[in-house]
Swiss-Prot record:
Keywords in alphabetical order: Amino-acid biosynthesis, Aminotransferase, Histidine biosynthesis, Pyridoxal phosphate, Transferase
Protein name from the UniProt record: Histidinol-phosphate aminotransferase
Gene name in the database record: hisC
Source species taxonomy: Bacteria, Pseudomonadati, Chlorobiota, Chlorobiia, Chlorobiales
Gene3D superfamilies in UniProt: Aspartate Aminotransferase, domain 1 (3.90.1150.10), Type I PLP-dependent aspartate aminotransferase-like (Major domain) (3.40.640.10)
Pathway participation: Amino-acid biosynthesis; L-histidine biosynthesis; L-histidine from 5-phospho-alpha-D-ribose 1-diphosphate: step 7/9
Presence of keyword Transferase: yes
Modified residues annotated as N6-(pyridoxal phosphate)lysine in this record: 218
Amino acid sequence: MKRDIKDLLNPALRNIAVYKVDGGQEAAVKLNQNESPFDLPFWMKEQILEEFRLEPWNRYPDILPFRGMDAYADFLGVSRDSVIMSNGSNEMLYTIFLACLSPGKKILIPEPSFSLYEKIALLLQADIVSVPMQPSLDFDADSLIERAKQEKVDFIVLSTPNNPTGKSLASPDIARIVRECDAIVLVDEAYIEFSREHSVLALIEECPNLIVLRTMSKALALAGMRIGFAIANPLLMAEIAKPKIPFASSRFAEITLQHVLRYYYLVTDAVSYILGERERIYAELEGIASLDVFQSDTNFLIIRVPDAQKVFHALVSSGILVRNVSGYLLMENCLRFNIGLREENDQLLEKLKSL
């Protein structure tokens, strides 16, 4: 008799669920996926499409997207051999984890953090060392360093600013972790453009164990293009590149990135708007007695309500989609929503005040 199909698969799959977005991805007011509320202007899309029209569609793209890597390296002011572009930062996460983890290797993950970290670590049969955030949802840098040393971890991943908490780890504390811990340290800066803290990109040259991860899905409004980057010391980057999927990024994504970087003032304007709205909404939420709101360094806010599931469904019934993040450690009855257009934000505020 043949074995059950599940017995032929990676045993880690038994402890992993398919990724899903509760509530779906369609709503009149969609604030559940931390997207930018601003699409690219039509005139830029026309320029991008005209350039892409001239590309050979029957040919593979470059093994690695060198045009995109050159453009982003120039933008950051780093060498090209310090940069790799990927098909979204999630693909880069898989690549980095493949390069750094194997059965028995130890990875330290602050909890809560982006759920994909744990999922990939489980798939690779690595040992996960979890370090809880403080009750305020802030990082505990001393505990991170202490546990990393005690457990002799091989790999540390830090989402800062953090998803789902919205909190940043102070830049000097990141530097301490990178310098004091005998481990590869991945700093996921998906939301860095919205943070009060500085990027740790400047540490790349002096810290051979540091990797910085970036996405173009948030501040650059390119979630649909799937563009991510890793930046690291060239010697480390050469190793990370080994498990990288070849031909994974399209020419279309490269061309789009080049145009957005050329007109970066549009990104700066959008970020300024989001930061202003974040502060306005935060102040409004502070005046609602039935909820607590947390300070944020991202393009989203976290609120704690008496009954998150009830409020979530009430919002959905009004055409407003947010994210229920109550399942995360320390985040019972918490909801997350990104900053939208002003009229969308006002609809959310009005509904929350009425509940």
